[in-house]
Structure formats: structure tokens, C-alpha cells
Amino acid sequence: ILVTGATGYIGSHICKALKEKNHWVLATDYNDNQNDISQWCDEYVNIDIRKLNGKYYKVDKIIHVAAKTKVGPSVDEPWDYYDTNVNGTKNVVNAFTCDHFIYCSTGSAFNPGSNAYAATKWGGELITQQFHDKYSLVRFYNVSGNNGFYKFDEEVSHLIRKAARVVNSKGNDHPYMPLFGTDYDTRDGTCIRNYTHIKDIVDGIVRITEADATNQVECLGSPTGVSVREVIYTMKKVSGIDFKVEPLDRRPGDIAISTVPTESKFFRETQTLEDMCRDALEYEK
């Protein structure tokens, strides 16, 4: 099984889960990621998917995770996202042949016009469908949590990690928690998302990989949508810290509601929002 983006957050967890089930794993990535996944793969190849040219390997299955994934930067740098997420996917499809191509996408692909990240991931879905007879399109929803071995970047953009970092800040005066947008047409004025633990996401990916190609979209995400205010409330409850919150203007590219439309038969929710908050608090200590 070939895994692209193997040293990243989701990719490294996938490699670990596959090896624990005795699969042979060929891991690829191209960055200076500080995560050592040598124990979670049988072979590692340093590959920049943006520069792949020609045919490389025939493998049984491919899990294509490599991508640029942040909404905000995609608004400012759309062509960088196109180069990696669309052109890079085209190169992977062309360079490797397989019996089942699993494309890791995003729930944002349901609304590709919302930002460049969503548009380019949707473009990758179209390429996968066009050039593979046997595929599975897997859409993730606001992945959070950790299993203890992954080292995140210092820059924090994820809501739950950002709240945990506020809680774990040194000193008695905790910095404020930014709240981007309080005037959305939602139940409390803030964005609603489906936060899903990395363990449940990866378990779903492994089930899909071990099954036959579905040739359809598989949505891996919690069926319960929660608002930004509700996440902040949960973090305060779990941590016991009533930290400061500062309402700010909306962020470019954010949409009001992104929820799971159809739950995949491969998804099993075992972890809660409270679990994700506890994981983040432990990591940010």
C-alpha cells in the first residue's frame, strides 16, 4: 500500500494503523517534517508530487493524502494550492498504477466555490474519477486529536488546539481566544463544523482500504455538528479554565455550516468532542 503525504498529520496516523494490521507500507512525502515514521513503514521514498514525471511503481492500493490543507492561506495563495492539490494529484495518478485508488478529500468539496482549498480538492476528486476505474473518494471533517507520537507545527490554526494553547499558556493571565465571526446564520451566530477524532478517521480509512473500491464518496465525520462557541464551552468545561474570548471579524473563505450529509458505512464514532479537547490539552502542556 502506497501512502502519499506519509509524514503529515493524517498520513502518519494511517501508516501506523496499516502497519499495526501487518500491511506492507510504501511511504512517500516531500518536506522537512520532524515526524519520524520509519517504524510505521517498510520503505520510505522522498517524492515531490508536484514534480513527478513518468511511471514509477505498480502497487496494490494507493492512499493519496499529500495536499495543502489550510483554508486561509488558500485564499492568499490559490495557485500554490492548485499546483499541489490538482497538478500533484494528476502526477500521482499518472506515475503509479494500482487496483484501488483512495483519494483523501474534504467535506469542503461539497461547496467548491467557497475557497481555493475546497476547489482544488474537488478538482482532485474529478481527476481520480476520470482516470481510475476503481476508486474511493474519502471526505474528512475537521480532524482533531492525537495518539501521542505526532509532532504538530508550532503554528496553530485548528480551533481545538488553539483553545488548548490558550488554556495552557504560562502565567495567570491567559491570552484571549479569537472568535472569528459571530453573525453567521446559525443557532448562535458562529460557524458549525463536524469535529472528528483522528482515530475514528483512520479506522475508517483502513476499513475502506481493506474493502473493494466503492467508486463513490465516503464521508468520514461525526454526524453531530457543533458551533465554535460550543467548542469553546467544551474546552472551558474540560479544562476548568474560563479563558477570555474576543469576537473578531469573519475569516475569508469560511462558510457558515459544513456538516456530514451522508454518513459512510465505514465510519464508527468512538471518540467525543471532550476526548479531542483532552488530547489537545495534554499535547499543549
Residue ranges and their predicted role:
Residues 2-20:
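N-terminal Rossmann NAD(P)H-binding glycine-rich loop of SDR-like oxidoreductase domains
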Residues 64, 90-118, 134-136:
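Conserved Rossmann-fold NAD(P)-dependent oxidoreductase catalytic core, especially the SDR/UDP-sugar
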Residues 76-101, 126-127:
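NAD(P)-cofactor binding segment of oxidoreductase domains
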Residues 109-116, 138-158, 185-187:
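Flexible, glycine-rich beta-alpha linker
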Residues 114-141, 161-172:
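Active-site Tyr-X1-5-Lys
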Residues 49-84, 108-112:
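NAD(P)H-binding glycine-rich loop region in Rossmannoid oxidoreductase-like domains
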Residues 105-106, 128-149, 173-182:
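Conserved beta-loop-beta element that borders a ligand/cofactor-binding pocket
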Residues 162-285:
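C-terminal substrate-binding subdomain of Rossmann-fold SDR/epimerase-dehydratase oxidoreductases
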